[in-house]
Amino acid sequence: MGQKVNPEGLRLGIVKTWQSRWYADKEYADFILEDFKLREFVKKKLHHAGIAKVEIERSLNRIRLRIFAARPGIVIGKKGNEIEQLKNEIRQKVVAGKDLAIDIQEVKKPETVAQLVAENVAGQLERRVAFRRAMKRGVSSAMRFGVKGIKIICSGRLGGAEMARREWYREGRVPLHTLRADVDYGFVEASTTYGRIGVKVFIFKGEVLKDERKKN
């Protein structure tokens, strides 16, 4: 089962927490759609900033966005001009009439964040870099920054082949069935001249909960 399911969803409430934190009764579906639109808008608007994830918290008519970015300077801009412009655009296009607060957090090691690694590999594929070279670069740079293991999967018409196939490259351990393992996951689709290529990245950063069996 661990091989099939999203590793972050499988670990929610164990070693992972929710990226949307709020409670709603009748407006539940509306809030889910609004969260989806918020994330899509932020990622499209700030695609050069290296957005790892967007956390959303709600209280009454207030929404707080926490944006994790590899290049926070692009998001903030000179004297905070860019972030004010972003706030205004979100208020106009996505969350009309709601109070909005935005926090920016820097991602210290983007080479160890699965979503950013996947985006980097996908970007190389779109620039016609050989898929094996792109995968090996991603793996070697992550291992250099001290992760316990990484696995990258590319699937589609690799190298312009007639038949779609799936290839993967792994280094270290990536225990997808171990629930106490901190496994980061990222997925991106690369749009190439031959069609779309899916890029999945799994990064194992170590075990969060101690193994109680060793004590007994």
Curated annotation (Swiss-Prot):
What InterPro entries does its record include?
A: KH_dom, KH_dom-like_a/b, KH_dom_type_2, KH_sf_prok-type, Ribosomal_S3_C_sf, Ribosomal_uS3_bac-typ, Ribosomal_uS3_C, Ribosomal_uS3_CS
Record bears the keyword Ribonucleoprotein: yes
UniProt keyword annotations, A-Z: Ribonucleoprotein, Ribosomal protein, RNA-binding, rRNA-binding
Recorded hits in Pfam families, A to Z, give: KH_2, Ribosomal_S3_C
**Superkingdom of origin organism:** Bacteria
Keyword Isomerase assigned: no
Q: Which residue ranges does the record assign to the KH type-2 domain?
A: 38-108
Q: Name the PROSITE patterns for this protein.
A: KH_TYPE_2, RIBOSOMAL_S3
Q: Which GO molecular function entries does the Swiss-Prot or TrEMBL record give?
A: mRNA binding; rRNA binding; structural constituent of ribosome
- A cellular-component GO term for this protein: cytosolic small ribosomal subunit
Gene Ontology biological process: translation
Subunit-structure text: Part of the 30S ribosomal subunit. Forms a tight complex with proteins S10 and S14.
Q: Any idea what job this protein has?
A: Binds the lower part of the 30S subunit head. Binds mRNA in the 70S ribosome, positioning it for translation.
- Please report which protein family the annotation says this sequence is part of: Belongs to the universal ribosomal protein uS3 family.
Q: Could you tell me what this protein is called? A: Small ribosomal subunit protein uS3
Q: Which organism is it from?
A: Desulfosudis oleivorans (strain DSM 6200 / JCM 39069 / Hxd3)
